[in-house]
Amino acid sequence: MGTDNKSKVEARASARYFKMSANKARRVINQIRGRSYEQALILLEFMPYRACYAILQLISSAAANANHNLGLSRANPFISEAKVDESTLFKRFQPRAQGRGYPIHKPTCHITITMIEKT
């Protein structure tokens, strides 16, 4: 009748206000979700998108957090959760003809990676 209160041991890393559209970052995140740490590194190294480098650094940071804070080895972790959330827009104006201003919206996003040890 009692519930098992085992807490998952997970390491997390997040990048906030990353200057990229959420859809462009999701295109990369969807490829690595549920994969092991080593598979994700190999995939990100050879994908041709600009978001890959930042996500590669984020995965390395999550693995370092797992190693340092939780004592997990770098051999077994896998990406249990990877999400991209939209953030605020940087709003700018581009000067146009006859004194008008044309709005420029520069999107940002929050990227969160959660890793757990595969048993």
Curated annotation (Swiss-Prot):
PROSITE patterns: RIBOSOMAL_L22. InterPro entries: Ribosomal_uL22, Ribosomal_uL22_bac/chlpt-type, Ribosomal_uL22_bac/org-type, Ribosomal_uL22_CS, Ribosomal_uL22_sf. Gene3D superfamilies: Ribosomal protein L22/L17. It is found in: Plastid, Chloroplast. The keyword Transferase does not apply. GO terms for cellular component: chloroplast; large ribosomal subunit. GO terms for biological process: translation. Its main location: plastid. Keywords: Chloroplast, Plastid, Ribonucleoprotein, Ribosomal protein, RNA-binding, rRNA-binding. GO terms for molecular function: rRNA binding; structural constituent of ribosome. Part of the 50S ribosomal subunit. NCBIfam families: rplV_bact. Belongs to the universal ribosomal protein uL22 family. This protein binds specifically to 23S rRNA. The globular domain of the protein is located near the polypeptide exit tunnel on the outside of the subunit, while an extended beta-hairpin is found that lines the wall of the exit tunnel in the center of the 70S ribosome. PANTHER family: CHLOROPLAST 50S RIBOSOMAL PROTEIN L22-RELATED, LARGE RIBOSOMAL SUBUNIT PROTEIN UL22M. This is Large ribosomal subunit protein uL22c. It comes from Angiopteris evecta.
